């Protein structure tokens, strides 16, 4: 049995502070507040390294692929033939690609396990539950007239809400309905959270979320419920519930019906096509290193302006085209390799073990990939938190499947 020393006592206090910050982060990540509790937790983790160094064993190639991805994106800043090397491009690169990695590196400075990770998802579920109630209240209060077609609850960015909906709700849904040793009360909490969020998602009027949830949730049901008759009944009930919610909101019904519209009748879709065409031209003109990270907006508004004026956009609302246009074939391939590897290890583990963690991660990864078709990952500054969350959940998955094993020397604890 370990004796309690001043050092072990200090480490215990630091661990409690770190976990408290993580809980606060899960409860506040949707709010526009000055304090980022995930960053605060990371800072205390760095302080913890002063007292003890973890023993790290990595059983995955993921960090090599992350390094390759970061290197290839950085090369676009140095070697692109559009702009010279500048601090502004470095700042954009840091905000979009470096800072969010805090989410995955925090696993090296705190001992995560399935119990404390589950506690964090209770916090995420509570945040989604409260925000969904706020969205529903806004809808029935008629706030859609004041705020336009996008309702966001306590959040102030529909892009952020869109991304986290597709990142986190699939995980909560898997935890709710997949047979596991999670307690009945917790599964009920997650299921109620999903139940309340369905109308909220519909009233938020973000079509890629309709598409992502509409594809991923039925798949989750089919893979989680072994009795296929029950699974089909569940899917039918889910569809009827969603249909009923759409009938309450004519605006949402119209938004849904325009998902596949590609002409000028739906300018939101049409301008995306124009941006995609411009991005493809950028890639064709600058195939190796692209136009450089942070240069898309300037090139789009000066050299690749579409025939019809669109909004003042800073990315093309498609991650692959964004990577190809800004970082060329090197960045595009490194991005694809990274995500293909994540799909490979998670699908391989699920087929091998049928475990709930792999199914939850695959579901989140698939939904987020769908989001990346018309929205953007690797956004910087005020909307970089979805990328941080993506890396955080990837870190959780690596820990839970022992791709990363963190341990501490007992002698160091007793010094």
Model-predicted segments: where are they?
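Loop-to-helix entry and N-terminal half of a specific, functionally important transmembrane alpha helix
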Residues: 17-25, 64, 189, 193, ...
């Amino acid at each position: 049995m370990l004796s309690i020393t001043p050092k072990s006592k200090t480490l215990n206090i630091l661990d409690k502070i770190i976990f408290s910050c993580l809980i606060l982060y899960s409860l506040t990540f949707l709010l526009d507040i000055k304090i980022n509790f995930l960053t605060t937790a990371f800072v205390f983790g760095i302080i913890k390294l002063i007292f003890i160094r973890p023993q790290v064993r990595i059983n995955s190639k993921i960090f090599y692929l992350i390094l390759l991805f970061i290197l290839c994106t950085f090369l676009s800043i140095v070697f692109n033939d559009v702009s010279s090397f500048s601090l502004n491009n470095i700042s954009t690169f840091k905000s979009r690609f470096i800072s969010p990695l805090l989410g995955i590196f925090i696993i090296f400075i705190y001992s995560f396990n399935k119990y404390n990770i589950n506690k964090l998802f209770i916090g995420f579920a509570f945040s989604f539950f409260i925000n969904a109630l706020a969205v529903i209240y806004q809808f029935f209060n008629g706030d859609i007239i004041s705020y336009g077609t996008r309702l966001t609850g306590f959040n102030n960015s529909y892009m952020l809400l869109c991304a986290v909906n597709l990142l986190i709700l699939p995980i909560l849904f898997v935890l709710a309905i997949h047979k596991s040793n999670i307690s009945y009360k917790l599964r009920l909490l997650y299921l109620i959270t999903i139940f309340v969020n369905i109308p909220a998602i519909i009233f938020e009027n973000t079509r890629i979320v309709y598409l992502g949830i509409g594809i991923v949730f039925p798949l989750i049901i089919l893979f989680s419920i072994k009795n296929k008759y029950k699974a089909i009944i569940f899917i039918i009930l889910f569809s009827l519930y969603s249909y009923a919610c759409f009938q309450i909101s004519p605006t949402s019904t119209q938004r849904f019906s325009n998902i596949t519209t590609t002409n000028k009748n739906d300018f939101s879709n049409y301008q995306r096509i124009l941006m995609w065409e411009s991005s493809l031209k950028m890639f064709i003109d600058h195939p190796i290193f692209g136009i450089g990270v942070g240069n898309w907006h300037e090139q789009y508004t000066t050299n690749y302006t579409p025939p019809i004026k669109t909004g003042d956009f800073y990315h093309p609302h498609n991650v692959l085209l964004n990577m190809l246009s800004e970082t060329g074939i090197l960045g595009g391939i490194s991005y694809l390799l990274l995500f293909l590897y994540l799909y490979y290890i998670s699908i391989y583990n699920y087929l091998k073990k049928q475990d709930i963690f792999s199914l939850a991660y695959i579901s989140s990864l698939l939904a987020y990939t769908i989001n990346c078709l018309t929205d953007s990952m690797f956004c910087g500054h005020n909307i970089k938190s979805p990328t941080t969350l993506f890396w955080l959940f990837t870190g959780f998955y690596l820990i839970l499947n022992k791709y990363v094993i963190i341990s501490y020397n007992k002698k160091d604890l007793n010094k």
